[in-house]
Amino acid sequence: MKNTNIKSIQLGLALIAAIGMLGSCKKELSVQPSSLSEEKNGNAISASTPISVALNGFGNSLSDSIYVMYSADGELFRDEIPAITLPTAVQQYQTENYQQNDQLSAYTISDKDGNLKSYVSIIRYNERPVALEYNFLGTFKKVLEQREWADLDNEGWHIGGLFEDRDGNNRDVVNLNLLPDEIKNYMTNNYPDDIIVRAFQTKEEAIIVISKNNGGFANVFNKNLELQKHLSICDANCQLEDIEKSNFSTNLLKNLSNTFPNYIFDYADKMNVNGVSMGNLIFINANNTRYAVTVDVNGNILSNKVVF
């Protein structure tokens, strides 16, 4: 009987210790990043508080959400609104540039006196979230940065994460010699005069092939190696010539960072027409969505085309 009582006491102590350890672990895991602390103004919360968006399995991520970042100038606040109340200009922009997108949520950004400053619209495009900011008239301003939970307080990425390519190692580049025969044959049969110059693979296993032929083209093949899009990224008679990012002007770098925060640079070309420089064509990755951005000779953004 004495041994039984001792064993019961030991078991009880072990259970108490285990509960304590679980409580300690839960407390450690529940600590939220500093950027998630909320400052409220009535029903609105601080515009700089990250917005959680469900991933629905994109990129085979272990986490179930990403977080949309908003850098506020001054004291600004965010209110969720019905997406149908977004300006017509916003809805048209998204329909034209993100075909077959699904609207997820929408917000207004206002100052403490309630003056409208901008709109934020979050959509799902190609099974991934895209967050866009527009000014108070509905004109496009920027593609907002996304981060995973673990990266809210660091530089926005970690190896093995959804946004690991922000480390600049260009692991998405495909060796042209290793392009699948199905893609090579398709390009040869359908665009025989095109010269393939680059290729990239997305996290959805799509392959983007960049080709040149009196202009530039982005050819998107899905994971089944079927052509999904053939997009002109440089007008006819436009001759493309490689340019390094190190040759970008300060103004160009600033405009890219302001419009695509924490973007990934893939490559760039000078655009020449009849020997005259028309600016640059820049291919970037913003939150795993690919864009072809054109800028003038002064580094001002002229257009951005959604590639995939």
Task: Report residues per predicted region.
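Long, charged/polar, surface-exposed segments that mediate recognition or autoinhibition
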Residues: 86, 90, 148-177, 231-262
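Sec-dependent N-terminal signal peptides
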Residues: 7-16
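Acidic/polar, low-complexity intrinsically disordered N-terminal segments immediately downstream
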Residues: 2-6, 26-124, 128-130, 139, ...
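Exposed beta-strand-loop-beta-strand "reactive/processing" segments of non-cytosolic proteins
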Residues: 100-134, 193-220, 266-294, 307-308
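Acidic, serine/threonine- and glycine-rich low-complexity intrinsically disordered segments
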Residues: 168-201, 249
